Structure formats: C-alpha cells, structure tokens
Amino acid sequence: ENESFEQSEEKDENQYSVNIPMRYYYKGKFRKGWVSISNCFRGTWVVGTPGSGKTFSIIEPFIRQHSAKGFAMVVYDYKFPTLATKLYYHYKKNQKLGKVPKGCKFNIINFVDVEYSKRVNPIQAKYINNLAAASETAETLLESLQKGKKEGGGGGGSDQFFQTSAVNFLAACIYFFVNYEREPYDANGKKLYAEKRQDPQTKFWKPTGVVRDREGGSIVEPAYWLGKYSDMPHILSFLNESYQTIFEVLETDNEVAPLLGPFQTAFKNKAMEQLEGMIGTLRVYTSRLATKESYWIFHK
C-alpha cells in the first residue's frame, strides 16, 4: 500500500496568501489539508503533464483569491477565452463587492482576435526617459521574440556580438522615435498645443516651453509627451528602409549618434556581410511583429 507523510491541516492565511484545499492519504485513510502559499512573491513553479489539472487546481485558485484581495494580474491565456472569461467574472464580482482598487480596469491584448483587444503603446517617453531604458526595452523585446531559441546554444562570442549589436541598434531606433518632435497631451489623451518660435539664425522652429490647451488658449501643464511617430509600427517600418536612409535620420539625434559607430564603420567600409549580421538579425526577429494585427494594437 502506498503511504505518504503527514501534511499541513491548518490554513495559514494572510493578506497575500493563496490557500488551496486538498486531500491526502496517511495511515490508512484520506485526510483533509491545506496547501498554503503564504509568500507568493517568491514565485510558484507549477509542473505537471498535459491534462493533469494544473490550471484547475493551482492557476484558477490564484486568480480567484488574488482578485478578491485586490491584486493586479497579468494572465497569459493560451486557451483564450477560457481564463479570460473566468478572470472577468471574478473582476466584476469583486468590483461589485468593493474589493477592486479604484481605477483598476480589465483589458485584453489579443494578437489573433483583435476585436477583443485594447490598443497599447509601450514606446513612450514616460516609460523610456533615457538610453538605458531604451536598451532594456530593446533587449526584452528581442529576448521575447527569440523564445524558441535554445539558451547557451550557438556560436559563442560571435553570436553574442551580433545579439548585442541588434539590441544597440534597436535601442537607438526606439530612443530616436521616442524623442522625435515630441507633442504634449492631457490626461485624457487629448493633444495640446506647444508654442514654437523661429530661430533667427537657423530659421528652424523651436519650442518655447509654453503649452496651451489650444492655439491662443490657456496655459496648461501636459500630463505626458509623446513623439510624433513614437510607436512600434513606425519603428518596424523604419527598420526596413535602406541603410543609408536609416543612418542619415538617426545621425540627427546627438544622443543616438554614438551608438551608430560600429554600424557606420561597416557601412562605409562596404562590409555588407558584417552589417547584415548585425542588423539582419534584428530584422528577422522583428518581422514576426509585422502583421496588420500587431500594427493596429501597437499604434498610438
């Protein structure tokens, strides 16, 4: 007869815990107990064969209990709309009971059935305020697009060189578009009017720093600034331009220019194979996002 060990029969509950009821066999009979995950911030690894009940026994209790405790959740529903439907039910239920924090909303991002999806634009100055943030965004994006690639497999140093080059180049493009002709907006997403004055020497129009609710209107404080073309569709389209066009455009930003050194050197020396290795890697992976659905979702 299979025997197990004595397990916890007390419910260890706190404001962050997830408590899952269970049954176990001990000393000849089935007993009731609790699986108490008292510190979910340490991470929970769920392992089981397909159809073993991972979602029903672990994931769904997490959704139910964390929703009731006012947690913000990001749920990857690989069998949409199974989990999304249950999550929405608990969201509405707890909202009615006053357990959902004020301002908390329910949104879906769906790259297949876009009629269910909200639009989202992660390429904004409020998220990317310096080159370090742009590099982090670029690295995260490329790692996500390479999720099928085996870690540690490959050509070692040369692969790492091309990977780092791809990250740097994408970071340069992201930071350029984040800051190019930034425009002010209010908290409701309404575009405001930024006053400009013509420089008598260069004849270029430069912002004065004064923002109004409309031309000639009242002076206001913008909620955020957004680059004129600051979104993924414009960046992805820009990556498919000729190398000469790309370099000429990016060179106009003094902060971005230093990142372009290795690429410009390869281009001027006509080392096209090296250039394709550096930028071609980026183009191949980002091409996965070049769909009508992705463009609609990521458009500002």
Model regions and ranges:
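P-loop NTPase motor domains
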Residues: R23-R31, V35-K300
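N-terminal pre-Walker A segment at the start of P-loop NTPase domains
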Residues: N2-V35
